[in-house]
Amino acid sequence: MARRALIVGTGVADRIAAGLADDYDVDRTPGAESLDLVVWADYPALACEPRQITDLSPADWDAACDTPLRSAIDLTRTVHAPLAATRGTIVFLVPLMASAGGAEYTALASLGEGVRILAKSLAKTWGAAGITAHSITLDPHAFLAADDAAGIAADNALHDPPLGRVPDDRDDVAPIIDWLASPAAAPLVGSSLVVDGGLWMPG
């Protein structure tokens, strides 16, 4: 019987869904009674556009950061029981800017850091139910237009990625997410992984 995954978001979420499709029945909206894996990457287009914070109206900020963060929190309430039914895993995908900062991406960085901390909090509170929670920080190319991502990567790196390339969302990142949902990864709790080929190496 195939495992069931819920993938929330577009863009990078679509590519992760494609990478997991051979091993999971993939849902894109909540509703299943049991879930082995939930992946969240629901970043609105407004957050992924370069904008000075002073150019964002209160309504813009709500749309780019506060509302999607609240939606992520609400999603966790919805998926708790389905994940508990299988002792499943929830993974939040986070842009590099949440850790390293990014000029003109304050909303995106704030939203990313919000869900990263949410993952840690869930790991502490849901562990007793057998649910594991993690975040994975990805290269800006996973979230931004190519030219914008290249600029952010250059601003935050002292070297080219040791891997020699940016990891592919479907072929490289999706298998890591699949591993996080495996029994072998069960002792790893509340991790904040960085999967960018070695571009950003936090201490």
Predicted regions located by residue number:
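Catalytic Tyr-x(3-8)-Lys segment
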Residues: 152-172
